[in-house]
């Protein structure tokens, strides 16, 4: 029984070490994807003002402008394109640039010393 407990403890410790490997933050960020509200369509709202705002278009992977009525806005509603990209474009956050991931080459997201696990983003 004590060997079983020791084995379980070692497995938990190994899992914790792997999860905290330096450089793994990018892997987690790329896999996590944007927040759920970034997939919502733009919402003008019931008011009749005309403010230019930006929303993240999950289909194209770009931030696009739309007209916001001024009240009851939803979360996919940003003052400028930079804020939109920072919040919703996980590819841009991970790679330090803007644009979508669809045209990116295969990218490895492995902790140092592990076998390559590549996948195509987008």
Curated annotation (Swiss-Prot):
Expression by tissue: Expressed only in the uterus and the endometrium.
Family annotation (Pfam families): Kunitz_BPTI (PF00014)
Keywords: Disulfide bond, Protease inhibitor, Serine protease inhibitor, Signal
Function of the molecule: Inhibitor of plasmin and trypsin. Also has a weak affinity for chymotrypsin. Could serve to neutralize the activities of one or more serine proteinases generated by the proliferating trophoblast during the formation of the noninvasive placenta.
Segments forming domain BPTI/Kunitz inhibitor: 38-88
Coiled coil: none
Induction: By progesterone.
Site (Reactive bond): 48-49
Disulphide linkage map: 38-88, 47-71, 63-84
SMART domains the record matches: KU (SM00131)
Propeptide, residue positions: 21-29
Signal peptide: 1-20
GO-annotated cellular components: extracellular space
Entries under InterPro entries matching the protein: Kunitz_BPTI, Kunitz_BPTI_sf, Prtase_inh_Kunz-CS, TFPI/VKTCI-like
GO terms, molecular function: serine-type endopeptidase inhibitor activity
Protein name: Uterine plasmin/trypsin inhibitor
